[in-house]
Amino acid sequence: MKLLVVDDSSTMRRIIKNTLTRLGHDDVLEAEHGVEAWDLLTKNEDVKVLITDWNMPEMNGLELVKKVRAEKKYEDMPIIMVTTEGGKAEVITALKAGVNNYIVKPFTPQVLKEKLEDVLGTGSGEGAAE
């Protein structure tokens, strides 16, 4: 299964990608911002999950989520937002935009695992509200 990780921090992309690899997900694409992510998404029809930061240049994560959700072929794609924006208002805004799950940085690999399992329907359901 191909996943797309979007973050303007190369360090954060590496952390997320390494965690996903340890979880058995070897096919991970990376983008630095929403414009690059959109380009990769439209050129890689087999991307199944989008993991995106919120605050990025050119097109932020919230704008990316709205653009993805506006396309019928992506309406069911699981989206996880990984961000420092941890306020209740931000979480609600992201969920209303179409994010399926939300992780506040910093986070542990276990949290990413649980959130990914939750959006894929493969986990026990624990950790869905973190």
Curated annotation (Swiss-Prot):
PANTHER family on file: PROTEIN PILG, STRESS RESPONSE REGULATOR PROTEIN 1
Protein name: Chemotaxis protein CheY homolog
Residues that coordinate or bind Mg(2+): D7, D8, D53, N55
Start and end residues of each Response regulatory domain: 2-120
Gene Ontology cellular component list: cytoplasm
SMART domains: REC
Requisite cofactors: Mg(2+)
Entry keywords, A to Z: Chemotaxis, Cytoplasm, Flagellar rotation, Magnesium, Metal-binding, Phosphoprotein, Two-component regulatory system
Gene Ontology process terms (BP): archaeal or bacterial-type flagellum-dependent cell motility; chemotaxis; phosphorelay signal transduction system
Listed Gene3D superfamilies: 3.40.50.2300
Alphabetical list of CDD domains matching this protein: REC_CheY_CheY3
